């Protein structure tokens, strides 16, 4: 059966934070889980992914 999280009654935000903590401990990355993220977290994740893509593209460039 599923994991039981102790949260205050009706506190959805806290429940989502606890679920995200649990998933990250299991090695499920933020990009792969489909649960609510704060807008600032989304912006940060997208910025990190963009920087990673740019870095990969720079490594692929062939110096001639």
Swiss-Prot record:
One of its GO terms (biological process) is translation. One of its GO terms (molecular function) is structural constituent of ribosome. The keyword GTP-binding does not apply. Keywords: Ribonucleoprotein, Ribosomal protein. GO terms for cellular component: ribonucleoprotein complex; ribosome. Belongs to the bacterial ribosomal protein bS21 family. This is Small ribosomal subunit protein bS21. It comes from Neorickettsia sennetsu (strain ATCC VR-367 / Miyayama). The lineage of its organism: Bacteria, Pseudomonadati, Pseudomonadota, Alphaproteobacteria, Rickettsiales.
């Amino acid at each position: 059966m599923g994991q039981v999280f102790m949260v205050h009654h009706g506190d959805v935000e806290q429940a989502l934070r606890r679920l995200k903590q649990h998933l990250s401990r299991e090695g499920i990355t933020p990009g792969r889980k489909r649960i609510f993220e704060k807008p600032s977290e989304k912006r940060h994740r997208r910025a990190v992914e963009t920087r990673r893509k740019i870095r990969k593209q720079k490594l692929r460039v062939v110096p001639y």
